[in-house]
Amino acid sequence: MLDVAIIGCGVVGAAAAYELSHYPLHTAIFEAENDVADCTTKANSAILHAGYDPEPGTRMARLNVEGVALAKEICARLDVPYRQCGSLVLALSPEELPHLQKLYENGIANGVPGIRLLSAEETLAMEPNLAPTVVGALYAPSAAIVSPWEYALAMTEVAVRNGVELRRSCRVEDAEAMADGGYRLTTTQGTVEARYVINAAGIWAEKVHCMVEPASFHITPTRGEYYLLDKSEGTRVNHVIFQCPNELGKGVLVSPTVHGNLIVGPDAVPVHGDDTSCTSKGLEFVKTTAQRSVPSINFGESIRNFAGVRANLDVDDFIIGEEPEAPGWIDL
C-alpha cells in the first residue's frame, strides 16, 4: 500500500511530491498525460504574484506572500530560471485610482514588501513605453517571473531521485474509500491502494473529488489565449504590466519572460474540458486590450500563439485540506 498517492503532476502535484520526498514515505504520482507539466502548468502567464489582490485573512493572501519568497529559494536551489522583476498595476483613467488604493490597502494588510502607489510621472519613468494616458500605478517589487514547466520538471526530478514513483499516461478513473481507511484507486495501469490521496488534478479536480463524494466546490475551466513575441520585443517592458483586475481575473498582461521574450495575454473564456484552441476573436481581444497599456508593442514579431486552460473556482480562495466526509483525501 502507498502512503500517499498524488493525482496530477502539474506544478502543484510536483511541489507536493517534492516536499513529501524528503520524508520516509512510499509516494507515487499518477499523471494522466504522457509527461509532467503538460496541462495548465505549461500554458500560463508564468507570474509569481506579490499578494496584494487577495482579501486579507484568506489562505491566498498569506500564501501568495509566503509562496513568492519560497519559490525564489527553491528556484535557486534547483537552478530554475527566475527573475524578480516586480509588477505594476496600471490605472488608465481617474476612475480606476480608487481600485489601486484598495489593492494597496490589501497589500499592506497582507504584508507585501515594498508595495507603493506611484504617480503618472513615476510610472512612466519606470516604464516609458506605457500609454501616455496612464494616471498612476501600484508597484509591487516582490512579484516575479519563472519558467513554470522547468519549475515543475525540476521538482519532479528531485522527487523521483528521492524515491517517489512517477506513473505517466496513468489516468485515475475511479476512487473509493476502504472500510479500514485509505482509498482504492482504479487507474488505466491497474488498481492501487493508498493511505492518503492528494488531489492535484487541476481543471479535473472537481471531477476527481466526486469519485469519493460530492464536491463542495465547483470549477469552471477557463481558456486564456496568448501571444509570445520574439526576443526583439523582450525589453519593451521591464516589469509585469497588469491592468486593473475585474471579475474575470487580472486582465490582459504584458510581461517579459525569463527567456527574454515578451508574453501578452490572456483573455478569459469559459470552456468545456481542456479546449486549448486559439481563436481570431480571442487573439484580437488580447491584442487590442494590451495596446491600451503598451501601445507600441509590435505584434508583427509574434512567434507563437497558444492557449491554456485554468481552473476558476466558485470561491475566492485556495482549497487546501480534507473534508470531514473524506478523511485522508486532500484537495489542492
Q: What are the language-model segments listed below?
A:
Residues N199-P214:
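Flavin (primarily FAD) binding-site architecture
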Residues A46-M126, V135, G251-V252:
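Dinucleotide-binding Rossmann-like beta1-alpha1 core, especially the glycine-rich loop
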Residues H22-K42:
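Glycine-rich FAD pyrophosphate-binding loop
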Residues R62-V65, L90-H99, L138-E157, R167, ...:
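Short beta-strand to alpha-helix junction loop
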Residues E213, E225, K231-L262, A268, ...:
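Mid-domain catalytic core of redox enzymes
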Residues G249, V258-H259, D274-L332:
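C-terminal catalytic lobe of FAD-dependent flavoproteins
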Residues L138-Y196:
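Helical element adjacent to the flavin cofactor pocket in flavoenzyme catalytic cores
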Residues L2-A28:
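N-terminal Rossmann-like FAD-binding beta1-loop-alpha1 element of flavoenzymes
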